[in-house]
Regions:
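N-terminal intrinsically disordered, cationic/polar leader segments
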Residues: 1-51, 81, 86-122, 126, ...
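Alpha-helical segments in soluble extracytoplasmic regions
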Residues: 53-69
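Short, mixed-charge, low-aromatic patches
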Residues: 48-56, 73-76
Length: 133
């Protein structure tokens, strides 16, 4: 046991948390689709209890969209990706803002949800191009 404690350490480096197969923009897309569906249900229901629950769930799902996008932005994409796709930073910034308080988290706008899904689709296309490389 002591030999292990005092053994020289070995430094290791990893490209990402685990092999890159764990990353997928589909997670953000599924949550964004849920947000859009909830917005539609909100518009069709006047029950205050239902609306309260729906808003809470919509806000939680919007946070999950941001989380999944941030993981891709900070853990999967690396400097060579940003060099090849210089629009990536802007896409992620715009998408996370659309999922935030000024977008689907704070408002119930189908237009915001559609814009968010479009940004996620753009990110997804780039993601899959990088996976092919």
């Amino acid at each position: 046991m002591f030999a292990r404690l005092f053994a020289p350490t070995v430094e290791v480096h990893a490209h990402c948390d685990l092999p890159c197969g764990v990353y997928d923009p589909a997670q953000a897309r599924i949550e964004a689709e849920s947000v859009k569906a909830i917005i539609g249900k909100l518009a069709d229901n006047d029950d205050p209890d239902f609306r309260t629950r729906a808003v809470i769930i919509k806000e939680q799902r919007s946070e999950l969209v941001k989380h999944h996008l941030w993981v891709l932005w900070t853990d999967y994409f690396k400097p060579p990706h940003f060099e090849k796709y210089p629009q990536l930073h802007t896409l992620f910034n715009e998408a996370t803002k659309l999922a935030g308080a000024a977008g689907t988290k704070g408002k119930s706008s189908v237009d915001d949800a559609d814009q968010l899904l479009a940004k996620i689709e753009e990110i997804s296309k780039i993601f899959w191009e990088t996976k092919q490389a």
